[in-house]
Amino acid sequence: MKIKLAKSEVIHFIGIGGIGMSGLSLIMKRKGFKVQGSDISNNKNTNRLKKENIKVFVGHQKENINKATIIVVSSAIKKNNPELLHAKLKQLPIYKRGEMLANIVSLTKNIVVVGSHGKTTTTSLIASIFQNTKIDPTIINGGIINSINNTAKLGKSDWSILEADESDGSFIFIPPTYSIITNIDREHMDYYSSMKELNKYFVNFVDKVPSFGKSFICLDDKNNKNLIKNLKNKNFYTYGLDIKSNFCIKNIKQYRFFSEFDLRIILPNKKKRIIRK
């Protein structure tokens, strides 16, 4: 999906205080767009946004969107929200967070982390690794990353590192270059009609990874194993504690502030390697 955006647009985020919405709004602001939003109360996220000169309305009222030309709505917002209803009455373009996220990263090489659990931790680890390289990626995470002291950062390179939210199915709009699937659990059944439908979304997402990219799927999760069986796109590696994983973690030792482990790597047509860390 390609969303045409002009710098004159006023983009209003309904539910801007959410961790994912606040990060996306920050990136849009730093890209030069006019950004505002609303939430039911102030929190740490809205306070960070105010420091970036992003206007935040406390409470949801139809008057909040008087100047808005585009609406981005959180998956937590109910259908009877007065701002959402007024936006529909005004026939304003309305997008889910995932749709807008997909639009701003569509021209970048990206790493997209999806799954029911562990997304934020995984995204944070990848982002922190990139922070120690010469690559300066755009980062949008579901939690504070210590290395940037924020949930999001606009980078100068053509790389993006993203945490994608599966709660409303909008992650399917994101075109992944590299994807990481942590696990799939029985969640968000208010949106998905069944586990079968939830699994189908993940299958469709992984199948979109191009031949020059790659997916990395945790083999420790039983639903991920079912995911693999249904994939048309076999361009993936597996990881985890499972001995059949391409990247297998062994001999784990946990200490107070760090862990040690051996990493066994077995790739098709490659010699087995063991990295001790």
Question: Residue ranges of each PLM-predicted region?
Answer:
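Adenine nucleotide phosphate-binding catalytic loops in nucleotide-utilizing enzymes
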Residues: I3-V10, I14, L49-K50, S74-S75, ...
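Active-site-flanking structural segment that lines cofactor/substrate pockets
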Residues: Q36, S106, D262-I265
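Short linear motifs in intrinsically disordered
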Residues: G37-D39, G143-I144, N149-T151, N246-Y255
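Short, ordered loop/turn segments at secondary-structure junctions
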Residues: I40-S41, Q61, E99-M100, L241
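ATP-dependent carboxylate-amine ligase
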Residues: M1-F57, K67-I71, A87-L92, S124, ...
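Phosphate-binding loop of NTP-binding sites
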Residues: K2-K4, I27-F33, K50, E63-N64, ...
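A short, glycine/Asx- and small/polar-enriched loop/turn
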Residues: N66-A68, K156-D158, Y255-S259
